[in-house]
Amino acid sequence: MCIRDSYGVETSYVPLDDPSAWEAAIRPNTKMLFLETPSNPLTTVGDLRALSALARARGIPLVVDNCFCTPALQRPLELGADIVVHSATKYLDGQGRVLGGAVLGSRKYVAESLQPVVRYCGPTLSAFNAWVLAKGLETLSVRMARHSENALAVARWLEARPEVERVRYPWLESHPQHALARAQQRAGGAVLAFDLKGADAAACKAAAWRVVDGCRLLSITANLGDVKSTITHPASTTHGRMPAEARREVGIGEGMLRVAVGLEDPQDICADLARGLAG
C-alpha cells in the first residue's frame, strides 16, 4: 500500500462478489481491474467470466492473482483474464524454499508491456532458485489435490464444532458462492477461514488466540503455501494495518482464524485444532 501510494496510484475498492459494483466503480482514468480469487482470508470468489466480459467491454485489462488456486485448480486466462500473477513463493514451490513470482499473459502483452521492464530489471530467478522451483512444479497437481482433499475434510469437521460460528471454504455447500467456485475451479484449494463464537469482539479475539496458542502441529505464521499446515489471526497479522472499522466492514472479525491446510493426515490436523479449541 505504501509503495502504491508513493507512485500516485489511486485504488477503488469494491465487493469482490458484486460485478455491478465493479462496473459502477470504473472511472475515466481506470487502468485495470485487479482481483484475487478466492480472496484472502474471506475466500470470497470473484466471477471471472463476468468480470472479464466487463473488462473487455470497457477496454481495460483484467488482472488476476491466482496464488491460492495455482494453475492446477484454476486457469484465469482460459476464463477471459488478460494477465495472471502468481507468488511462486507459495504453492508453486510448495515447500517454502524460494522467493519468486510469475506474470503471465498474451505474447502481445509480454512484448509490449513486460519486455521493456525486464530488459533493465532482469526477467529470471537465480539459476538455483529456478531449478528448485521447477522441481516443485513437478508435484504441483498432486500436492494441490491433497491440499484440497485435506482442507475439505477439516472444513467439514470445523462446521460441526459448537465453538465455531461460521466456516469459509468454497467447496463447502454452505459457502454462498459454492456453485460459482465449482464452475471455475477444479477443487477448493488449501486455505479456509473460520469465525469463533463470542459475546463481543474482545471475547472473540481472546478465544482466537487461545486456539492459536493451543496448537502444536500447526505452525503459527502469516505465511502459507507450504506442505505444513499453518494458522494465523488475520486481524492481528495479515490485515493488522487496516483500521478496525474497515476490517469489520469487509467481514474480518476478531474471532476469525485462517488455516492453510497442509499435507499432514487430516485427522492429525483436526486433533490439533481440537486441542486449540479446548483452550
Residue map of PLM features:
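Hydrophobic side chains in well-ordered alpha-helices
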Residues: 113-114, 207-211, 269-273
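PLP-dependent enzyme catalytic core of the Aspartate aminotransferase-like
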Residues: 7-12, 28, 229-279
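Short, solvent-exposed beta-strand edge segments and adjacent coil->beta transition regions
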Residues: 98-100, 187-191, 254-258
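Residues that form or flank phosphate/diphosphate-binding pockets in enzymes
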Residues: 42-43, 71, 202, 206, ...
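Conserved small-domain helix->loop->beta segment predominantly found in fold-type I
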Residues: 152-227, 243-244, 248
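Short, well-ordered beta-strand elements within core beta-sheets of diverse protein domains
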Residues: 132-142, 189-201, 258-262
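Short, flexible turn/loop "capping" segments at secondary-structure junctions
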Residues: 94, 125-129, 183-187, 249-254
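Conserved PLP-enzyme active-site core in the AAT-like
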Residues: 4-162, 168
